[in-house]
From Swiss-Prot:
It comes from the Eukaryota. This is Nicotinamide phosphoribosyltransferase. Homodimer. The modification Phosphoserine is found at S472. Its main location: nucleus. Belongs to the NAPRTase family. Keywords: Acetylation, Biological rhythms, Cytokine, Cytoplasm, Glycosyltransferase, Nucleus, Phosphoprotein, Pyridine nucleotide biosynthesis, Secreted, Transferase. It comes from Sus scrofa (Pig).
Amino acid sequence: MNAAAEAEFNILLATDSYKVTHYKQYPPNTSKVYSYFECREKKTENSKIRKVKYEETVFYGLQYILNKYLKGKVVTKEKIQEAKEVYKEHFQDDVFNEKGWNYILEKYDGHLPIEVKAVPEGSVIPRGNVLFTVENTDPECYWLTNWIETILVQSWYPITVATNSREQKKILAKYLLETSGNLDGLEYKLHDFGYRGVSSQETAGIGASAHLVNFKGTDTVAGIALIKKYYGTKDPVPGYSVPAAEHSTITAWGKDHEKDAFEHIVTQFSSVPVSVVSDSYDIYNACEKIWGEDLRHLIVSRSTEAPLIIRPDSGNPLDTVLKVLDILGKKFPVTENSKGYKLLPPYLRVIQGDGVDINTLQEIVEGMKQKKWSIENIAFGSGGALLQKLTRDLLNCSFKCSYVVTNGLGINVFKDPVADPNKRSKKGRLSLHRTPGGNFVTLEEGKGDLEEYGHDLLHTVFKNGKVTKSYSFDEVRKNAQLNIELEAAPH
């Protein structure tokens, strides 16, 4: 952020209103508040059973929040004054903890006396385990732990995008392996089309970066800069794209000149892959007559490295894909691969970028398999469903206090609402461990201090205003790999 933008963000104004009043609500002589974040397990699913269970989550995005919003001198005299004035009007009362913030400014030069411990970024952890913990490091600042809940819990978004994207990768990997015998090109099978479908530039950057944990294809440019700035990669960029047509570059030629539009575009990009949206008027006519006959000579002469990628963009996704493949299969030479599935020639592929979410994706690849088409023939583009059609409830992302110190005594605390057992929270100081069998287990009530459980997988990533541990994007990707990828990799 430039200096002006830096000055704009005020951590004193980046919390839920009610938290401004909480310093007055904790028990007298509270000196520590310790809280944790998890993606709660749903032990009792609603009657409307979800097709996808989301049993494990990808932990990603906390590093961005810590670096962008919490590190360094985040408290200044001006920010305290600004907050004081805003809250006086907002509450019509003097409830703001001016003294507490001045203490942080004076004693710590505006750095937050907080410690955050977290699992490594990119870790794949079963639901119901601790992912990070937060505690104050100065007894005067017991109220600060849950003040920053608001901004820290926004990590639900990159976690959920990365998790949902990875679940789609599981589906694609399974069907690609079954219909081709290998995982070649898996990381380009789901392309991010979501830039225009998200709520803001920042959302675009965060969401696109989360998808790139699992894949390498994106049209959401904002993700690239975020990854380079907050994570870093060994490659010059973490995501790639290809030249592609939109409807305007076709329809601008006029309805009677779709063939001319197609011809011009494939000629402009003859030595690289090029995607051409082909449903401006009639996708089936485009495949059969224009691509299959009129321009066939231009397509068959393209190289394996520079295929034409035909993009349908309307209609029922499964029906459209199958019909397009059927037409192309009659117009171009189809071969059978080693697994007995049909394969278009290497200079021709299809991308479905309309109506793609995790459920339609599953339907399309299953439908293709049943019709004996290899998944090698297709890639997918997903926008709103990939980056926007998600909420904090999908993975039940939750932040709760589990331990306090009052009058010098540590107390394990929790909630356990009578009407919803799913909302029961964990007790005491928490740690995360691997059992000898390789399973993850969260230990409550400080039991992780006992030697027998091995080391804690939560590492200090932030302490007293400093980010103390960072992960490169390459490490994040490695942590998030699928088991099927690890098994298929050459040993």
